[in-house]
């Protein structure tokens, strides 16, 4: 009985008004900008491993303290972005396996201390069930029994089939538990700040190697460009979403795409511009009051590109050359297969 009473007191403490207010503060733009400033220190001094470990600790602490599962999302994203620079670092991080155990305990503690009755009926529950069924049964009749029950196949079935359904149920239960804020507003704020941090990482790298940029007059190669480009692409639609209420947020979308160009990612070059076009078209169609303002912004950008087209193509030409080379390689391969 004593242990039960102690456990009850601990749960009551972590669900007290003071802890709840702390959790609410961890979802504010001010707090996320504090995390931005901290993450910037690790980027500037190029101590990525220390940055990953620090934000892993912050994520774990936030999981224990906060009832809302959205609160640990910002530090986790900062962790992921800093971690993109830690290429082939398994031998480094395996030394901190004890921290991994602690983080798993933090995840378990979150669900124990902030237990909620699972919300089984969500907006996407039925589609997720159909997707899970398709993943589980998709190979039946097409692959052999041995292939179907292989380790890799079982992993994908459990992770992408059952796992994604369970993950959706968990997030549907534990995100936005208080219902006193707009989930999309908070999520868009987080993603725009993360996009700004990704842009900062790219800008910081270029400033660090500015002499090389001046000498070569072209973009720089860095290993983490594709991963960083992915985060920037994820952030573009959220910048436009916030632009519905704050017009200046739209400029962040163009800034993120410019950062994608600086990464030299071919996928980012192509799919990023598709994202921008889709977002712009939606704004032209539905935001009639500011339609002329958007046209003016695009006209200025196009005019600037026309004036500096030679310099633009010269600086970013390496990415375009790699893209055309990849396309030619695919076409040649298809021609050989046709023969």
Label for each model-derived stretch:
Residues 29-30, 65-77, 117-131, 180-189, ...:
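Membrane-interfacial loop-to-transmembrane alpha-helix junctions, especially the N-terminal start
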Residues 203-206, 262-263, 283-331:
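A membrane-periplasm/extracellular boundary helix in multi-pass inner-membrane enzymes
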Residues 3, 10-112, 138-143:
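N-terminal signal-anchor transmembrane segment
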Residues 9, 137-155, 179-181, 193-230, ...:
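Membrane-interfacial helix-loop-helix modules of multi-pass inner-membrane proteins that assemble, modify
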Residues 96-106, 126-138, 147-172:
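Aromatic-anchored transmembrane helix interface
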Residues 56-60, 132, 163-169, 181-212, ...:
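Alpha-helical transmembrane segments of multi-pass inner-membrane proteins
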Residues 45-51, 90-99, 152-157, 218-232:
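Membrane-interface micro-motifs in multi-pass membrane enzymes
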Residues 44-45, 60-69, 107-118, 167-180, ...:
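Structural signal for the C-terminal ends of transmembrane alpha-helices
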């Amino acid at each position: 009985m004593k242990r039960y009473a102690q456990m009850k007191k601990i749960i009551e403490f972590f669900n007290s008004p003071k802890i709840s207010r702390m959790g609410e503060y961890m979802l504010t733009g001010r707090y996320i900008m504090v995390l931005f400033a901290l993450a910037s220190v690790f980027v500037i001094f190029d101590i990525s491993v220390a940055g990953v470990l620090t934000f892993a600790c912050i994520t774990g602490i936030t999981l224990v303290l906060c009832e809302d599962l959205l609160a640990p999302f910002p530090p986790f994203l900062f962790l992921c972005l800093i971690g993109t620079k830690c290429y082939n670092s398994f031998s480094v991080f395996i030394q901190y396996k004890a921290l991994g155990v602690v983080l798993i305990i933090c995840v378990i503690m979150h669900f124990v201390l902030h237990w909620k009755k699972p919300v089984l009926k969500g907006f996407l529950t039925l589609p997720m069930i159909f997707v899970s069924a398709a993943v589980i049964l998709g190979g039946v009749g097409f692959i052999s029994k041995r292939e179907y029950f292989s380790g890799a196949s079982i992993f994908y079935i459990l992770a992408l089939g059952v796992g994604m359904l369970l993950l959706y149920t968990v997030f549907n239960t534990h995100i936005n538990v208080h219902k006193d804020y707009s989930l999309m507003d908070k999520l868009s704020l987080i993603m725009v700040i993360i996009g700004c941090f990704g842009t900062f990482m790219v800008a910081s790298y270029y400033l660090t190697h500015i002499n090389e940029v001046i000498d070569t007059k072209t973009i720089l190669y860095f290993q983490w460009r594709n991963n960083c480009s992915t985060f920037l692409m994820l952030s573009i639609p959220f910048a436009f979403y916030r632009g519905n209420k704050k017009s200046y947020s739209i400029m962040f979308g163009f800034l993120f795409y410019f950062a994608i160009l600086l990464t030299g990612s071919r996928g980012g070059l192509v799919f990023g511009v598709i994202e921008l076009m889709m977002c712009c078209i939606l704004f032209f169609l539905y935001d009639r009051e500011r339609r002329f303002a958007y046209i003016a912004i695009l006209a200025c950008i196009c005019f600037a590109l026309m004036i500096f087209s030679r310099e633009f193509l010269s600086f970013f030409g390496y990415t375009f050359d790699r893209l055309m080379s990849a396309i030619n390689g695919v076409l040649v391969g298809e021609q050989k297969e046709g023969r």
